[in-house]
Amino acid sequence: MTPLALIMIIAAYLLGSISSAVLICRLLRLPDPRTVGSNNPGATNVLRVGGKGAAAAVLLCDMLKGTIPVWLGYYLKIDPIILGVVAIAACLGHMYPIFFHFKGGKGVATALGAIAPIGFDLTGMIMATWLVVAFLFRYSSLAALVTVLLAPFYAWLVKPQYTLPVAMLCCLIVLRHHQNIRRLLDGSEPKLGQKKSA
């Protein structure tokens, strides 16, 4: 691994560690998303506690945390596997942020942002899948899980050289959703627009 690759991996983790949800909620004087709703500092929980505007801001910032380091690596023609590690580092920063006591989000938006530089076709397929599943079933977590399970197949169709990095990233997202999977199975997972009961 080259020094440049190592620097990019560390920088991606540190950028990912900036918790958009916590900072935006502080700025807007909203409750800390780590202590209300689903206790997850992500766009879906901010939607529950702060509305669409705050959630959209969090979504955009979380995506940029993945897009910026991966786009830079893609521009510098870093090996696809290393690029995958950079993407994972950004997501790990979001999930376990060093600046916020390692209590972070699920990494879905950051992962989408990390995949975006690979191509608009792949990004469009991923976003369309999430939107369709979310619209039909009203579960953000289910939409995320279905999307990440299909994402490696989409990558294989349009950019096969990135199939393994995308699959690595998706495995991380699935593991991070283990509690959501349990709640989906027992019927206690809150739907979109529904406040999580205490």
Curated annotation (Swiss-Prot):
Pathway annotation: Lipid metabolism; phospholipid metabolism
Catalytic activity as recorded in UniProt: an acyl phosphate + sn-glycerol 3-phosphate = a 1-acyl-sn-glycero-3-phosphate + phosphate
GO molecular function: acyl-phosphate glycerol-3-phosphate acyltransferase activity
Membrane spanning residue stretches: 4-24, 53-73, 80-100, 117-137, 139-159
GO terms for cellular component: plasma membrane
Keywords carried by this UniProt record: Cell inner membrane, Cell membrane, Lipid biosynthesis, Lipid metabolism, Membrane, Phospholipid biosynthesis, Phospholipid metabolism, Transferase, Transmembrane, Transmembrane helix
Main location: membrane
E.C. designation(s): 2.3.1.275
Keyword Transcription regulation applies: no
Annotated membrane topology: Multi-pass membrane protein
Matching PANTHER family: GLYCEROL-3-PHOSPHATE ACYLTRANSFERASE-RELATED, INNER MEMBRANE PROTEIN YGIH
Quaternary assembly: Probably interacts with PlsX.
Protein name: Glycerol-3-phosphate acyltransferase
